[in-house]
Amino acid sequence: MKGEAYYSVRMRASENGPHEEGGKHISGGERLVPFIGLNDAVSDLLEKGMSHSRGRPDFMQIQFDLVNEPIKLVQPLRIETNETVSAEEGQALARELISRAGVPESAVEKAFQGIAEYWGVRGAVLFDIHSGRRIDGRKEKGVRVSRLDWPEADFQRWAALCGVPPNPRLKEALAIASKVCEHPAVIAELCWSDDPDYITGYVAAKKLGYQRMTKMKEHGDESGCRIFFVDGSADVKSCIDDLEKQPVFIGQEVNHESIIR
């Protein structure tokens, strides 16, 4: 990838105005592509934003900018699926997994108690495992993991090797989790989607990999959750900067051809 210029392409879509003016979040997306791939990336993100089950957006922003920093290659987390028959079972297993990842049970309990407060947060909440408090200071904005991509050809090879369906939702979620858990300050991630039609969620951690729970909420529920359990004694500002700004490719082998399509 030396000598090749890459661009970070980002999309956000909302209903009833922009997010910062109280609009309802509909969709978002990220790509990292060379100049020749910009048209396809913008078209793909436009289609994603216009066809989401959360509603029809009346505001959409698609922007791109040149990536000036070296792009880091991060290996995808290993994946495991846990069949859960109810939201209660799924969330109970999530609590157990987060504790196994190294988060004190008291902090896990406090985080789950505060989930209802975080439903309006557009990005992720950073939660200190020592104090049991939110520490990102971003209010409704939260922390948006950005500047990442998983080239399609590499993702297809990975999915075939792991024997999992190569669906775009898994690709996006695992890419985010892999970048997040690569950071040394992050102990674990808890996530489930705000998509009312998608009830699967996950816990991710360096120690545990990407642990999917097949049911984490009820059908029709538009509330989502994304919490990063972090070591608050680390440099939190640096952690946020890396999650938002460090360009990352997920994958085993990344080359120019696989990134274009």
Swiss-Prot record:
<comment type="function">
    <text>Catalyzes the transformation of pimelate into pimeloyl-CoA with concomitant hydrolysis of ATP to AMP.</text>
</comment>
<keyword id="KW-0460">Magnesium</keyword>
<keyword id="KW-0547">Nucleotide-binding</keyword>
<comment type="pathway">
    <text>Metabolic intermediate metabolism; pimeloyl-CoA biosynthesis; pimeloyl-CoA from pimelate: step 1/1.</text>
</comment>
<dbReference type="Pfam" id="PF03744">
    <property type="entry name" value="BioW"/>
</dbReference>
<dbReference type="GO" id="GO:0009102">
    <property type="term" value="P:biotin biosynthetic process"/>
</dbReference>
<comment type="similarity">
    <text>Belongs to the BioW family.</text>
</comment>
<comment type="subunit">
    <text>Homodimer.</text>
</comment>
<dbReference type="GO" id="GO:0005524">
    <property type="term" value="F:ATP binding"/>
</dbReference>
<dbReference type="InterPro" id="IPR005499">
    <property type="entry name" value="BioW"/>
</dbReference>
<dbReference type="GO" id="GO:0042410">
    <property type="term" value="F:6-carboxyhexanoate-CoA ligase activity"/>
</dbReference>
<dbReference type="GO" id="GO:0000287">
    <property type="term" value="F:magnesium ion binding"/>
</dbReference>
<keyword id="KW-0436">Ligase</keyword>
<keyword id="KW-0067">ATP-binding</keyword>
<protein>
    <recommendedName>
        <fullName>6-carboxyhexanoate--CoA ligase</fullName>
        <ecNumber>6.2.1.14</ecNumber>
    </recommendedName>
</protein>
<keyword id="KW-0093">Biotin biosynthesis</keyword>
